[in-house]
Each structure stands twice: as C-alpha cells, then as structure tokens.
A protein has these predicted regions:
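Conserved kinase catalytic-core helix
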Residues: 92-98, 120-183, 194-209, 216, ...
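Active-site acidic catalytic loop and adjacent metal/ATP-binding pocket
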Residues: 63, 200-250
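Catalytic-core segments of class I nucleotidyltransferases/pyrophosphorylases
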Residues: 1-48
Length: 350
C-alpha cells in the first residue's frame, strides 16, 4: 500500500489516521474490501467469538449447520486427509455400539447430529459437579480403550512425541523471540530452551514404557467433548484417528494427557485467543484465561494412576504444547504462546 515508509514518518501517536492522511495532500489509489466487516471496537469482535464458540473449526475445515444437522467438509488437503480418518473412527465405534458420540446421518456428505449441549469448558460447575463429570469422562474413555489393542510401535511413539514436535519447532525457530537463548524466563520461571536441550528431552524417552497400543480418541480436549444438557452425559466429537504412523491405535497416555491439557493447561481458552502475551526485554509473561477446572487435577490423576504416573502426564502435556506451535499457524501470538507455555511445563519434568 505504501511503497515508501517515509510517507508515514510524521504519523502522530494519537488521533484518526484517515483524517491525518487527508491533510497530507497525497493522492491514494483505493480498492474495495468486499465481504469484510469493520468492527471498530475489540468488544464487538469478542462478541462474534462468543456467538461462534462451540461451533468453531480449524482453518482446514468447513462446517455448516442446518437445524439439528451439522455437515463437515475438509477444505484443503490436510482437512480432507483428517476427514478420512475421522469417518473411519466413527464407523469403527458405531460397530462397537458406542453411545458417547453424535448420531451420524451420512458419511457422504459427512452429516451428524447437532448436540443439545455445550463444550465442557463452557459450563460453570461446582467442584463436586466437576468431579462427577470427570468420573464420566474417564469411564467413557476407558470404555473406548477396550475396543481394541495392537502391538506398541516405537516409531509411532517417537514420531508422535518427538519427531513431529522437533519438525514443527524448527519451522518457527526464526519467528519466536529468545529462541536462540539457552534459557528463557517464562512467568518468572527460568526455563531450559528445548532447542539447546533436545538431547535431554530425547533421553526422557529412552526408557519410555508402552507395552501395547489401545484404541484412542486422540484429541479429547474439552473443545472436542460436549455434555448433553438433558442427561449431562459426555459426547465425544472430532476424533484424531491416528497416533504417529499408526491408524486408530496408540499410547493410552496420549488420551489422558489431552484431557489434562484442558483441565490444567486451559488449552480451550488459549485456542479461543483468550490469553495475553507480553514479550519484554528479558522475559516473557503469558496469562491464559482459566477453564476453572484446575481444582480437580489431583482427583483426575488419582482416577488414572493405574495407567499413568503424574510425571509422565506432565511430560506429554509439555510436548503437546510444543507441538501446537505450527498447528496455530494462523496467529503469531499463538505460535509464540504455545512455545513458551511448552517450555514452562517442560521445565517441571526435564
């Protein structure tokens, strides 16, 4: 728009930009911003997000709602590939007579029941009510995990936890402030930078124990689980359908860590851009709005203690945050925030 930045050198710090431009005696070429909307105030933009909440989808998906029917469609190669896996997952659990999913009306087009309820993070529940919901979530996930077993595949474990993460991190190294510093201070915590401590992270997996794979959901955050308003029963949506190089099956810890991601990590608020990132001269401050489920952390971990220990959950949780970096490619603050949050949690277990 401006080929010579000197044209803007005298822009005042306050006031209306357009009015100032009118006073400069310059001639500008204009073009129409068709199919766009001016919001003016941040509060108006937030209202749009609130109306969309619960109906948001990733940039690679398109979702339409007609009455009580939701139709999903992949809009690019990534979205189409994920749709194939999602459909296969639903077909599998339908054959197992699994009840904690929406009714599927057709696979071509991919149409399903619109649940009369909300995503779990949208509910304002008391502590005892939250515990009841956690009980139900753990129960329905454990049922899901009984639908099949497969030999553990080391290459899939490495790819899901390390290979994929390192590949994504390399793409953003030149984008993130302090990425070339050995330590980064995040929320007052001096954190080892994974770019300099990659070997230490790899060593954490040298003795990683996973004897067998189970059938997974793979993306069971609060954003992908709803509660039926009438029965308060969980409804699982948007399954991932793969783990590393393995279709359908994977490390059971991954599902438990994804739930922890919402309970403690407040991923769902981060995903809605409800966070404040402040990059200072020598440190970083990241404040993510809370889902208000942190109080059930110990209760949740106690329910799954026979399948995974606390430190392992924390390790995988940190890796999931680091992996989010390029998955949030459409928003620079989200890229940086996911990286810094991953380092913050990784420091607890590295």
């Amino acid at each position: 728009i401006f080929k010579d930045k000197s044209k803007l050198k005298d822009v005042p710090e306050e006031g209306e930009l357009v009015r100032w431009m009118q006073q400069q005696g310059q001639i500008y070429n204009t073009f129409g911003l068709y199919q766009t909307k001016e919001y003016g105030l941040l509060s108006e933009w937030k209202k749009i997000g609130e109306r969309k909440e619960g109906g948001q989808c990733r940039p690679f998906n398109k979702m339409t709602v007609e009455g009580n029917v939701i139709t999903k469609e992949g809009v690019d190669e990534q979205g189409k590939a994920l749709a194939v896996r999602e459909k296969a997952w639903y077909k599998y659990v339908i054959n197992k007579n699994y009840k904690q999913i929406p009714q599927i009306y057709s696979f071509e087009p991919f149409a399903m029941q619109k649940i009369n309820g909300k995503n779990i993070y949208q509910y304002d529940l008391q502590l005892e009510q939250q515990k009841e919901v956690i009980d139900k979530l753990v129960k329905c996930l454990k049922e899901l995990h009984t639908f099949g077993k497969a030999p553990a595949d080391y290459f899939s474990i490495y790819e899901a936890y390390l290979g994929k993460t390192f590949k994504r991190l390399e793409k953003i190294r030149d984008l993130v402030p302090f990425a070339n510093e050995k330590y980064i201070v995040v929320n007052g915590r001096k954190c080892r930078n994974v770019f300099f401590y990659k070997d230490e992270l790899i060593k954490k997996f040298e003795n990683y124990k996973c004897n067998e794979f189970v059938f997974l959901h793979g993306d069971n955050t609060f954003s992908n689980m709803m509660l039926d308003d009438e029965t308060m029963s969980p409804v699982l949506i948007d399954p991932r359908g793969y783990f590393g190089y393995t279709e359908m099956y994977g490390d059971v810890v991954y599902d438990w860590a994804k739930l922890y991601y919402s309970i403690v990590g407040n991923y769902d608020q981060f995903n809605l851009k409800r966070f404040r990132l402040q990059i200072n001269e020598n440190d970083v401050m990241l404040d993510i709005e809370s889902n208000h489920w942190e109080a059930v952390e110990d209760y949740y971990l106690d329910l799954i203690k026979d399948e995974v220990d606390k430190n392992t959950i924390k390790l995988i949780h940190a890796i999931i945050w680091l992996s989010l970096t390029t998955y949030a490619w459409e928003d620079y603050d989200s890229i940086c925030g996911a990286f810094y949050n991953g380092l913050y949690y990784l420091e607890e277990v590295l």
